[in-house]
Amino acid sequence: MAKKRTSTIMGIDEAGRGPVIGPLVVCGIIVEEKDLPAIEAMGLKDSKKLSAKKREEFAAALKNKYKYELSVLPPQEIDARFESEDNLNRLEVNCFAGLIRSAKPTIAYLDACDVNAERFGINIKKCLDFELEIVSAHEADSKYPIVSAASIIAKVHRDSLIREISEKMGEDVGSGYPADPVTISFLKNYYMKHKCLPDCARKSWKTSNAVIADCLQARLFQFE
């Protein structure tokens, strides 16, 4: 008699969808169904609702006990995809599908980036050549602890990459998000000095264009 396949559950979420600096990080964590109660008992939340210290503690515990995979898209790859008219939703569909393809779970819980959560799941399923159940939902990181786990690992990994960027640049680049004045100040200062944006910036972003426009305007005023 054939041995029954063990049910495996996968949660997937991303960090760094909106920033103008740094990569997009997608994490998939996979556990056996019997491990779900332990994940739930950890009291995980959406990574954005946790302190940095708590995120790092949870991430260390999760990585030590469960299998996970990361997909990291640097700014250059994001920009190249946009030049070929791929949008961010399509990029994430490909990343999510790649992680699912590698792990081949029985069920995958996804934090949908598309405004239509059902469509996001359908588009991912079209990329796969095997059957599985997909649960695609908005704010899945607040609804499903397995997705909260993926969210935490993705966020902690991206934060570490942003710290590396600051170290490489020799100054604080901030969080990388457009609303962060430290990030915008860094980009403007860099552009004024080098007449270009750094490699860590997503040059296809509207924020990048706005930074360049502001710098060019400032130069015009200097010569008036």
Curated annotation (Swiss-Prot):
It is found in: Cytoplasm. Residues 7-217 form the RNase H type-2 domain. Its main location: cytoplasm. GO terms for cellular component: cytoplasm; ribonuclease H2 complex. Its cofactor is Mn(2+); Mg(2+). Its EC number is 3.1.26.4. Keywords: Cytoplasm, Endonuclease, Hydrolase, Manganese, Metal-binding, Nuclease. A divalent metal cation binds at D13, E14, D111. GO terms for biological process: DNA replication, removal of RNA primer; mismatch repair. Manganese or magnesium. Binds 1 divalent metal ion per monomer in the absence of substrate. May bind a second metal ion after substrate binding. It catalyses: Endonucleolytic cleavage to 5'-phosphomonoester. GO terms for molecular function: manganese ion binding; RNA binding; RNA-DNA hybrid ribonuclease activity. Pfam families: RNase_HII. Endonuclease that specifically degrades the RNA of RNA-DNA hybrids. Belongs to the RNase HII family. This is Ribonuclease HII.
